[in-house]
């Protein structure tokens, strides 16, 4: 039992997760720090992702972000309204800290993931699927072009973690 506790503490300190992510295998890349980065998404330097499809964009925090936060115990989400690129729209509380979540794009919120109220841990276990935060109708789709692709974001995370 002591060995299991030591291994768990070491994994937490190193930011290593053993949570199964095999369902993500077809379109992912792994950075040196073992964060999952999906192809086909756009990424902000503040560690949020955007999946744009049709007239709606889905927004959440990245695997890299949740790994640095630790176990998320509470998520405060907006009830609706507008979001502005680079401005906070939500906050998440983990065992380590409370952090603002910035919107990578501007627009009108059309849906909020209410599952996160009862299950904030979805931000840890499924940040790109069940742990999405809001869906937004973008007001300025050109903002998506200023965000990073998967390769750029992976490199960004590696450089950030090296410092």
Curated annotation (Swiss-Prot):
NCBIfam families per UniProt: gcvH, PRK01202.1
Gene for this chain: GDCSH
Organism: Mesembryanthemum crystallinum
Record Pfam families: GCV_H
Cell location: Mitochondrion
Function: The glycine cleavage system catalyzes the degradation of glycine. The H protein shuttles the methylamine group of glycine from the P protein to the T protein.
Cofactor(s) of this protein: (R)-lipoate
Name of the featured protein: Glycine cleavage system H protein, mitochondrial
Superkingdom classification of source: Eukaryota
